[in-house]
């Protein structure tokens, strides 16, 4: 039996669901991949970053509904403006004020296909404390969305209602400087950099 066949015979079950793969570029992720493989062998899912398909909102009512769902089931709230920091959940008045704050930056004549907001998710391995999820998500958001290049408004809601604690980040796509957010390969906002930031934080 060839070595590769022997290794596959032992590890095939563990890695059948893609545990051995990290999507995107592997630059700078060698240690992260080793950690991922060890956690995978022990039955843990790695940290995951993704933009929610169809998660952008186009109107104030859509945004208010999304915020109602995300921020009334949360255990920690982080607000880029600092006004709502420290809360576990938001009340109806908070959601209304936040919706109005986001909408002030929208251009009435501009109707982006993916919405005026972007909904992103950062999911963490089983056993990660909610406070750690909050702190990591906050650091990642500040690294990308509160920089000299641009200041974007966002709200983070941490959920601990599943095995894998996770942070929902709703981003107002128009920055204070007028830049419009999008995720793209070879763009300053790209999946690889977000994933790497989660590992580094």
What annotation goes with each model-predicted range?
Residues 1-201:
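N-terminal nicking endonuclease/strand-transfer module with a His-rich metal-binding environment
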């Amino acid at each position: 039996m060839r070595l590769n066949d022997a290794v596959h015979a032992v590890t095939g079950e563990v890695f059948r669901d893609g545990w051995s793969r990290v999507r995107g570029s592997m630059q700078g992720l060698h240690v992260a991949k080793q950690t991922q493989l060890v956690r995978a062998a022990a039955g843990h899912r790695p940290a995951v970053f993704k933009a929610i398909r169809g998660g952008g909102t186009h109107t104030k009512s859509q945004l208010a509904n999304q915020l109602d769902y995300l921020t009334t089931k949360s255990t920690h709230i982080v607000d880029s403006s600092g006004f709502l920091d420290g809360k576990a959940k938001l009340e109806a008045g908070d959601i209304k004020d936040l919706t109005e704050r986001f909408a002030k930056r929208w251009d009435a004549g501009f109707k982006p296909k993916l919405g005026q907001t972007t909904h992103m998710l950062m999911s963490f391995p089983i056993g990660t404390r909610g406070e750690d999820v909050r702190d990591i998500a906050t650091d990642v958001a500040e690294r990308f969305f509160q920089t000299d290049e641009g200041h974007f408004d966002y709200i983070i809601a941490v959920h601990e209602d599943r095995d894998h604690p996770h942070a929902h980040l709703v981003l107002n796509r128009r920055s204070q400087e007028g830049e419009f957010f999008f995720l793209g390969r070879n763009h300053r906002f790209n999946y690889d950099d977000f994933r790497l930031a989660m590992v580094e934080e």
